[in-house]
């Protein structure tokens, strides 16, 4: 015991004499001295835990405990302050004061970056607290009815600038998150394009929460509805949003083509022996392609879809038998949506034949042929608005010399099979103009 006291005393004297040691070495020596003092105290016979500790050990331990307690109180105070600021931001956002909410959100996240995950909202019967009127259940987060509002609360605010997304990995290149909101919305309008490719917009919303919010922008869906229905959709009633109107209201689809296949059997010529007569199975297809600007194309041909569908991407097709025109949507009192179209054959300017210009020829009575088509729009299976049923087909012949019009109506029989929609990816592979 005497040797241990001499070692402790000599170490203390040596530490006091060597004032030129670094701060790290001095801290290490102080910890060693405290440990040895406590060890000596425990080895002293007759001294229990109730006895008074030596002054160096008691002072060192009290200083460490005090520092830890002070640090813990500071962390609790900081978290409590961040909690109050975050709840205040939620309250301001619910009241419509978005700028004030942004300010409180930013201050709260500067204190505690993950404060949103440390808050548990409760509702008390008398509830007079700031967050008493809000409920959050992390276990039932997937059952939230308004996912858009939830994502808006999860946005990250930095230096008063709304950041829709953050890079997952560090990169030296410029990330899309640095773009302002206006530029991002313009990019989203290019994604939708003039072809109304809202399917790509929905896929884009799966990237992150910020893109989800941009994809739910009411202006994009309002412009899409105006392009489809025009002035007949000036009121939202009975729909709650423009997006719901576009998804639920009956409309023709633009990202593909409606196709029908008709098959019939006709009798062939009789053979020479008189005992055999050929029968022919005839197959032909009808194709109808709609465009958002009100144009429509129709083609009847025996060629199969793989060879015809690529030609119908634009109206500038070189197919001779194509019929071009305009269409409109009509909703009757029975809540059935019908499509009416007037189509005509593409006009071709024939060059003048100067070979027979001196011969008298019998004038041919020129006439214009217009076809009037009526279709009923309905859904079948799991797809919406993917079926067109024939309800009217007629040919209007207008003679240019007299101006008279002759109408020939066709009977809608089994030869007019329904047309079913087939989506074509190449139709929306690239954009020509923004929405």
UniProtKB/Swiss-Prot annotation:
Q: Which UniProt keywords apply?
A: Cytoplasm, Phosphoprotein, TPR repeat, Ubl conjugation pathway
* PANTHER family, per the entry: F-BOX ONLY PROTEIN 48-RELATED, F-BOX ONLY PROTEIN 9
Q: What is the lineage of its organism?
A: Eukaryota, Metazoa, Chordata, Craniata, Vertebrata
Locate the Phosphoserine modifications and list their residues. 124
Fetch the Pfam families from UniProt: F-box-like, FBO_C
What molecular functions are annotated in GO for this chain?
ubiquitin-like ligase-substrate adaptor activity
Q: What is its main location?
A: cytoplasm
Q: Where is the composition biased (Basic and acidic residues)?
A: 7-25
**TPR repeat boundaries on the chain:** 82-115
Q: Please describe the quaternary structure of this protein.
A: Part of the SCF (SKP1-CUL1-F-box) E3 ubiquitin-protein ligase complex SCF(FBXO9) composed of CUL1, SKP1, RBX1 and FBXO9. Interacts with TTI1 and TELO2; when TTI1 and TELO2 are phosphorylated by CK2.
Query: In which pathway is this protein known to take part?
Result: Protein modification; protein ubiquitination
Q: List the CDD domains hit by this protein, alphabetically.
A: F-box_FBXO9
The record's subcellular locations are: Cytoplasm
Q: Where is the F-box domain?
A: 173-224
Per the record, the GO terms for biological process are: fat cell differentiation; innate immune response; proteasome-mediated ubiquitin-dependent protein catabolic process; protein K48-linked ubiquitination; protein ubiquitination; regulation of TOR signaling; SCF-dependent proteasomal ubiquitin-dependent protein catabolic process
The molecule here is called: F-box only protein 9
What is this protein's function per UniProt?
Substrate recognition component of a SCF (SKP1-CUL1-F-box protein) E3 ubiquitin-protein ligase complex which mediates the ubiquitination and subsequent proteasomal degradation of target proteins and plays a role in several biological processes such as cell cycle, cell proliferation, or maintenance of chromosome stability. Ubiquitinates mTORC1-bound TTI1 and TELO2 when they are phosphorylated by CK2 following growth factor deprivation, leading to their degradation. In contrast, does not mediate ubiquitination of TTI1 and TELO2 when they are part of the mTORC2 complex.
Residues of the region (Disordered) are 1-25
Q: Sorted alphabetically, which InterPro entries does this protein's record hold? A: F-box-like_dom_sf, F-box_dom, Hrt3/FBXO9_C, MIT_dom_sf
Gene Ontology CC annotations of this record = cytoplasm; SCF ubiquitin ligase complex
């Amino acid at each position: 015991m005497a040797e241990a006291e001499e070692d402790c005393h000599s170490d203390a004297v040596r530490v006091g004499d060597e004032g030129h040691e670094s701060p790290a070495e001095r801290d290490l020596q102080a910890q060693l001295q405290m440990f040895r003092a406590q060890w000596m105290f425990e080895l002293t016979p007759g001294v229990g835990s109730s006895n008074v500790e030596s002054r160096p050990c008691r002072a060192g331990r009290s200083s460490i405990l005090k520092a830890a307690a002070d640090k813990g109180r500071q962390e609790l105070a900081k978290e409590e302050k961040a909690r109050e600021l975050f709840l205040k931001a939620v309250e301001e956002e619910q009241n419509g004061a978005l700028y004030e909410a942004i300010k409180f959100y930013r201050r709260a996240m500067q204190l505690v970056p993950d404060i949103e995950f440390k808050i548990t909202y409760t509702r008390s019967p008398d509830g007079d607290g700031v967050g008493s009127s809000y409920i959050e259940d992390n276990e039932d987060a997937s059952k939230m009815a308004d996912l858009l509002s939830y994502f808006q609360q999860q946005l990250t605010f930095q230096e008063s600038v709304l950041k829709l997304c953050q890079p997952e990995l560090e990169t030296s290149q410029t990330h899309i998150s640095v773009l302002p909101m206006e530029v991002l919305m313009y990019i989203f309008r290019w994604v939708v394009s003039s072809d109304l490719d809202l399917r790509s917009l929905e896929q884009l919303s799966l990237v992150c929460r910020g893109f989800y919010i941009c994809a739910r922008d009411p202006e994009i869906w309002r412009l899409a509805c105006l392009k489809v229905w025009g002035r007949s959709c000036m009121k939202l009633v009975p729909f709650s949003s423009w997006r719901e109107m576009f998804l639920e209201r009956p409309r023709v689809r633009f990202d593909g083509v409606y196709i029908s296949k008709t098959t019939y059997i006709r009798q062939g010529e009789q053979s020479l022996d008189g005992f055999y007569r050929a029968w022919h199975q005839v197959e032909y297809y009808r194709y109808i392609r709609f465009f958002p600007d009100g144009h429509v194309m129709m083609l009847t041909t025996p060629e199969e879809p793989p060879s015809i569908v690529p030609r119908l991407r634009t109206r500038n097709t070189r197919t001779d038998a194509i019929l071009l025109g305009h269409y409109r949507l009509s909703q009757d009192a029975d809540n059935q949506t019908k499509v009416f179209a007037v189509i005509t054959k593409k006009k071709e300017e024939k060059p003048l034949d100067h070979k027979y210009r001196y011969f008298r020829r019998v004038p041919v009575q020129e006439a214009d042929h217009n076809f009037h088509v009526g279709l009923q729009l309905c859904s079948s299976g799991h797809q919406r608005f993917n079926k067109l049923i024939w309800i009217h087909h007629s040919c209007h012949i207008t003679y240019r010399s007299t101006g008279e019009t002759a109408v020939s109506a066709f009977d809608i029989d089994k030869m007019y099979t329904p047309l079913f929609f087939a989506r074509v990816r190449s139709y929306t592979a690239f954009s020509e103009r923004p929405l």
